[in-house]
Amino acid sequence: MGAVPSTPRWGGSSSAARPLDTAEYLISTFIGDESFPISSDFWHKLLELPLNLQWPPHRVHDACQSLARNNYHTRHLAKILIHMAWCLQESISTSSGAPSLVYVKAVNAVYISSVFLKYFIENEKGDKIEDLYLSLDESEPIPTDITKDLNIEEFVMRSVLSFIGSIDVSPDTYLLHLELLNFMLIAMSTQLLSGPSPGPEDVNPFIDAAMSQESSLVILVVRKLLLSYITGPSISLNSASYSIYSEGSQPGVLQRVSSAAANLMLLPFNFLVSSSGEGSRSLLADCSLHVLLILSHYRKCVVGNEPITDISNDTTASDSLLKGSTHFSDNPYCKALEHATDVEFDRVDTEGNAHAGPVLRIPFASLFDALGMYLADEAAALLLYSLLQGNADFLEYVLVRTDLDTLLMPILEALYNAPKRSSNQIYMLLIILLILSQDSSFNASIHKLIVPSVPWYKERLLHQTSLGSLMVITLIRTVQYNLSKLRDVYLHTTCLATLANMAPHVHRLSAYASQRLVSLFDMLSRKYNKLAEMRDNQMQLVKGNSIEGNGLADDTSTEMHIYTDFLRLVLEILNAILTYALPRNPEVIYAIMHRQEVFQPFRNHPRFNELLENIYTVLDFFNSRMDAHNVDGEWSVEKVLQVIIINCRSWRGEGMKMFTQLRFTYEQESHPEEFFIPYLWQLVLSR
């Protein structure tokens, strides 16, 4: 059979005499305008040949355009997807022994499907996913093993997920697993055609099909994805891999996306479908994690009259009519992750704690270690957040670990290097610390863990520092960085809330951490005083009937109010230490005494005076004890500390006012998907 008229002319010598069974000819025929029945022998020839072509990007792009022109008539995209599902089903049934021809066919089918599906999704006009034509023509002869009304995306996703969930990763199956994960990411990328907040009109056929699978299959898939992430299998692909792109290049970028999500990310849709490439540690582990996160954070907005359990708390009139009749359907992957239990715990589980239905069981210890090892990766931080925020069993497991430094040290190092990190990653890490700080045993235990050295901390040498002191130092440093660069109120609040949770449980805070805590108050007070001066100057403009001055004064007053809250929160932190942990923290007392002048200007401030009364009660007590000691020569740091330590024993807290102990808890926003969906795709596309 000669080349069909619409087939691109690929060039090269002897093109007219090209054999009918070459990969180049078969691909050209696949994208042409002649429709081959789904039962035609053509499909077996196409899938049985190794696709070792090295096409430049423009040829791949031309091929995709050709299939797009002809697909309405040929339905070849739907047919290759059906053959892919058949190959996967056959691969599952013949999974034992050496890899057979069926594996070659499956890999080829997945890879070809990925290349062309990616182009179709990239170039969708509006939200017309139906232009994929995921159905067979009514005149198509249908084999007996499929029905006329076959839902192709459902059929395909069930086959893909069944293979991932039931077949172990091995040298023989590694490549197919990797290509399937790439295929899933491409198939689920229809999310990028919608806004960041899912609506009832959004069409995501493949990810919706994944959501409709039985819970038993969902649990198998989540377990395998987690295990692939934990073990990080890395197998050399060399001769086993192939690419129809020259030098691993791409056929193009996302040229048109009417998507708030994509616009927010400002990134090209240049996801690599090629098998060649390197991840941060294991390409399969990275892909597994990305697929798991996208599946578990997906939200399907549906219209219905049933009780609404997960809608916005927004009160705006524009949203109330829409969201009053819509809700998010349950996400089975999110549920599986939230109800996952430890395999070790399950062995000794009592009869009364048995869960109804299938439950995901994973090795928490291995997962804990893997997360600690790779927390520098943003996706790993997202997984840790998802588990701590949603899975009470995993949170409890983390809190009882005696080696919390496994998780905390990489988190603190990432925060230390905040200028090199994305703001989203900083938020995630700070929220993780806030969640952990809600537990009093965590706050107590971090001060018992001693870190021999902190090589990444450059400002000064930190030797034999408690993990708690290092956490205080790093959080304060993050506030200082935010104050000078990001100026994000939410970041400030999260840092200070974590410090406030820690404060009553502080034990032997280091000298440097104590100094930084008092310096934090000084830094915020200087910013407050500068704002107060600006406000006074602007008020003079207001008196001169300046409209501009009135607006500036309002802005400055708002900012002053924010800094008033920050200053009060720092005073609350100091108060909590002095009220509940003074005898155990002589360095904090020394730092306050050493810089006591920074508190004086605020002593009569109506928002601060009660809190400062306690600080001055402590100062008066220890200043009087210092005055009672006759010291020859000047006071040294050691001598002052010695007096403080001695008098800590006689401290009874007389005259101290008791304030309600601060306790901040993290509450996920009502529409977390508006943050997570764009963020997750940003990570996938930038890998």
Regions found by a protein language model. Name each.
Residues I31, S35-I38, H44-L51, D62-C64, ...:
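Alpha-helical repeat/alpha-solenoid scaffolds of the HEAT/ARM/MIF4G superfamily
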